[in-house]
Amino acid sequence: TLYNYVGGYEDSQGLQGTCRGVYDLNTLTTDEALLPTRGGDWYDGGLWQGLFLHDWGVNNDVIAASWEYLYKVIVLSNKSIERLTELQNRKDAPAELKNYVAEVRAFRAMYYYYLLDMFGRVPLVLSSSTPMKDVNQSEREDVFKFIVNELQAALPYLNEAHSNQKGEYYGRMTRPVACFLLAKLFLNVEIYTDNDWTNGSRPCGKTYRVKIGSQTVNAWQAVQAYCDSIRGMGYQLSSRMADNFVVYNEPSEENIFTIPMDKHALQNQMQYLFRSRHYNHGKAYGLSGENGTSATIETLRTFGYDTDSVDHRFEDSFFAGTVLDPN
C-alpha cells in the first residue's frame, strides 16, 4: 500500500526513521542539531558540514534522493487515484470509494506539503502519465493553494479516527491529520505564499483571506479554527512530553500522525536512536552507536543548559554529562 512508503528500510526512503533523507534535511540544516566530524570520522566529503552551513549544490545526494522519494510516492498516489476513479465510474461502484479517493488525495497533499516546505517552487504533477516535457515549475503560492484545496476537499470524507491508535485507521490519513496539516500551512502562510523571497517583503497572515466552510477568515484565525477542530476530536497535550515517546505510545492523546513500528502491520526502520548515540554512549548502555549527532549551542541555550533554570525536558531529550552503565 501507499502507507508502506511513509516509513522505510533504506536510506532516503521514508518521511522519518531512515537516514540521508527528509529528516536529515529538516534537522541537520537548522540551528537545532549538527552531525560533527570527529577526527576523520563522518567527514564524508564535507556532506554534513555542507548541510549545516547551507553550502550544497545539485550534486548533493541527500537532497536529490529526498526529492526523488517524495515524487515517487506522489506518482504512486496519482496511480491510485486514477484506478479508484475508474472504479468509481462503474455502475456498481460502492459508495465508500469516494472516501478512499479523498484519503489518497489528502495523502498526496501531505507529500506536496513536504516538497513545498523544503523546496518552494516545485512541479505539480497530477497524472501518472505526465511526460517530462510537460513537467514545469509552479510558483510557491500556487503549490500552497493546491495543497489547501486538496485537504479541504477531502476533510468531509475522512474518518475522525486517531491515526496513532491501533485499529482500522492505524497509521492512515484521517481528519485530524488533515487538520494538523492545514494548521501548519496557515501558520506558515507568510512564507509559503511568498513567491519572491528576495525583495525584503512578504505577505501578511492577518490580511490573507481563506474560506473555511461558509466563513471567510484570516490565516491566523484559520490556524486557530483547525487547532480547535483537532482539540474537538479528542487531542490534548500530554502532561509529560516524554510520555509521547514511550515504547507503547499508541494511547497518546498528543501524537497525531505517527509511523507504526509494528512487525505485524507496517514494518519500518527507526535509526535515530542508535544514530543519536556516540559509539561510547552506545558502549556504556551495551547498545550500538554512531558518530553521534549533537545539539547546537543555540539549542543548549534555549533549554537553559548549565544554568540554574534548565528546562525539565532537557534530560528527556539529550545525552549530557557523564554517561554511565545503567547496571
Task: Show which residues each predicted segment covers.
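A solvent-exposed, charged loop/short amphipathic helix patch at secondary-structure junctions
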Residues: 196-213
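Extracellular structured ligand-interaction cores
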Residues: 99, 106, 121, 173-180, ...
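Short coil/turn linking the two alpha-helices of tandem helical-hairpin repeats
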Residues: 114-117, 123, 162, 188-197
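Conserved, well-structured interaction surfaces
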Residues: 2-15, 36-119, 131-145, 149-167
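Extended, well-ordered alpha-helical scaffold segments
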Residues: 96-103, 142-150, 208-230
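Elongated scaffold/linker segments in the mid-to-C-terminal portions of large proteins
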Residues: 1, 7-13, 19, 32-33, ...
